[in-house]
Amino acid sequence: MTEDFYIFSCSYQKKVVPLRCNFKQINDMAPIKRTLQALITERMQPQKVMLLFGARRVGKTILMRQIVDSFKGKTLVLNGEDIDTHTLLGKASVSNYRHLFEGVELLAIDEAQHIPQIGSKLKLIVDELPGIRVIATGSSSFNLQSEAGEPLVGRSSQFLLTPFSQQELSAGETPIETYRKLEERLIYGSYPNVTLFDTYAQKREYLQDIVYAYLLKDILAVDGIKNSQKMYDLLRLIAYQTGSEVSYEELGKQLSMSRNTVERYLDLLQKVFVIYRLGGFSR
């Protein structure tokens, strides 16, 4: 049995070099409007939860804050990594949530996957607080999607934020600029911060930093994932086969791993948005 996989990644070297960026250049840049902003805003209705997924560093927090800033009404922004947020939401009762969110029309929770039982808590909030809207972001689908899935059936919409699309980038450049940057973007991708660096070396270093500091962090924290080197080796192998059919058995033989372990690792990589699976077409 074979499957197609598409991977976005960088060179898997272990050396990570601190980066220096021209912050004046960043501050002077006009913000690139994300196409999802209008879609999320349109669907953001009372008693509904907008779930925004995406890999780390693709701009979920910025997009969430842009949506909050443009909202005409009372808003509240919480950080799911803040222990105070856990304390506030810990007592899952109608009286507590009515007290906390009285008058709030838009509740935004960043990195919501860190909050225990987030799905049932969001369900209670939208069911019992008339007029409230919720937007929650998550850097992996391990907790947020699994916990929020069943409790929020019929109450939520899910969105996947990717690095900048060419459509988004083209809005601020001429066709000639787009043509000149095409090869660079095909090689280094379009993570928001990558587009700010001037040299290829800086882009490579930043991508390496993302891989080791962010993208694989969630995977290696999962119980049972002990051999990080095997994970890196698997990523190298499928990176060489981007857009081609891959065999679980063949990958397992090359890595001295069982087929089940290969499938499990690939499933985990997909859940943190390191790879995208493209199913084959059968006649």
Identify the residue ranges that each predicted region occupies.
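N-terminal pre-Walker A segment at the start of P-loop NTPase domains
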Residues: F8-T41
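Hydrophobic anchor at the beta1->P-loop junction of P-loop NTPases
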Residues: L52
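Conserved lysine of the Walker
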Residues: K60
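Hydrophobic positions on the alpha1 helix immediately C-terminal to the Walker A/P-loop
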Residues: L63, I67
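Short glycine-rich substrate-engagement loop in P-loop NTPases that contacts/grips substrate
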Residues: L76-L106
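Conserved catalytic/switch belt of AAA+ P-loop NTPases
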Residues: G119-F142, E150-P151
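Short regulatory helix/loop adjacent to the ATP-binding pocket of P-loop NTPases
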Residues: F142-Q158, E173
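Accessory nucleic acid-recognition modules appended to NTPase machines
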Residues: Y200-R283
